[in-house]
Amino acid sequence: MLRLIDSISDNCTVKTALYGALLLGVYKLTTFALSLVSLVLDLWVLPPVNFAKYGAKKGKWAVITGASDGIGKEYATQLAAKGLNVVLVSRTESKLVALAEEIESKYKVSTKVLAFDVSLDAESSYEDLAATIADLPVTVLVNNVGQSHSIPVPFLETDEKELRNIITINNTATLKITQVVAPKIVHTVASEKKKTRGLILTMGSFGGLLPTPYLATYSGSKAFLQSWSNALSGELQPQGVDVELVISYLVTSAMSKIRRSSASIPNPKAFVKSVLRNVGRRVGAQERFGTTTPYWAHAFMHFGIVNSVGVYSKIANSLNLGMHKSIRSRALKKAARQKKD
């Protein structure tokens, strides 16, 4: 290759440009290869993360929001299975009580429940949360509660209440809950002289990774969480607290309205298992600090997009637009049929 460059031109400037292009190409190829190797190691070679470092089986507590169903319920169940006591936070108290009884019976850990409708953003609810965890050695917080649009919708047609709820639930409540719980985590870690670490997981989305037309408010709310979580990670890591944004594509859940799992769409159990296995590892989010895309199919999708068209490209935006316009069209037709019936 060097001989070829020398033979192309005797002009020093041209040679310098060609050598520079060659070095840049080698650098890009090397970083791509190393990132791909790291992704594979994270997924299939490195052992699962040992939650003893977060206080599992040592009397420590995890707080999980949106804990009564789906992904949140799986976080609660799987963290309890690892030996963490759990504080279950969600809107419906009856579901929380039933889950708490199931967890205590099956995993022999302690539980607390708190009925908390985050869409109301009531100060009394945050005070109740603070009171619930006041005497608990909390080491883990899972910010799982979230809301999307009922169906894809142009921003200019978005219902004001839906817009407000998305921002309140995904952003305001997440930040305020973290302000309540994170100081307890920092205190617990400090009291043990950092022999136990803290962990804050916040649910992100491909909607935040890729600007998504027809889900503009939801997409923006999740993109906000990316920057906020990364900034918080920088602040709390020196204090012994790991902060990660968890990126996912679709998972079978009430919010996604998908009932049947597939290779690219896991059920909550498989998804949460991948999250907890890979805490502290980027997996598909190789280009991002304090971020993980842990489920294998989502990881390769994330890695592929970043290393091909790019997350902010016109191509990615147009593909997303077409997909969500189609989803909206089908949803409206289905609603029209149901109305006739």
Curated annotation (Swiss-Prot):
It catalyses: a very-long-chain (3R)-3-hydroxyacyl-CoA + NADP(+) = a very-long-chain 3-oxoacyl-CoA + NADPH + H(+). Belongs to the short-chain dehydrogenases/reductases (SDR) family. It is found in: Endoplasmic reticulum membrane. The chain crosses the membrane at residues 17-37. The active site is at 218 (proton donor), 222 (lowers pka of active site tyr). InterPro entries: 3_ketoreductase_fungal (IPR027533), NAD(P)-bd_dom_sf (IPR036291), Sc_DH/Rdtase_CS (IPR020904), SDR_fam (IPR002347). This is Very-long-chain 3-oxoacyl-CoA reductase. It is a single-pass membrane protein. It comes from Meyerozyma guilliermondii (strain ATCC 6260 / CBS 566 / DSM 6381 / JCM 1539 / NBRC 10279 / NRRL Y-324). Its EC number is 1.1.1.330. It is an enzyme of class 1 (oxidoreductase). Component of the microsomal membrane bound fatty acid elongation system, which produces the 26-carbon very long-chain fatty acids (VLCFA) from palmitate. Catalyzes the reduction of the 3-ketoacyl-CoA intermediate that is formed in each cycle of fatty acid elongation. VLCFAs serve as precursors for ceramide and sphingolipids. GO terms for cellular component: endoplasmic reticulum membrane. Pathway: Lipid metabolism; fatty acid biosynthesis. It holds the Pfam family adh_short. GO terms for biological process: fatty acid elongation; sphingolipid biosynthetic process; very long-chain fatty acid biosynthetic process. It comes from the Eukaryota. One of its GO terms (molecular function) is very-long-chain 3-oxoacyl-CoA reductase activity. Keywords: Endoplasmic reticulum, Fatty acid biosynthesis, Fatty acid metabolism, Lipid biosynthesis, Lipid metabolism, Membrane, NADP, Oxidoreductase, Transmembrane, Transmembrane helix. NADP(+) binds at residues 63, 117, 144, 218, 222, 251, 253.
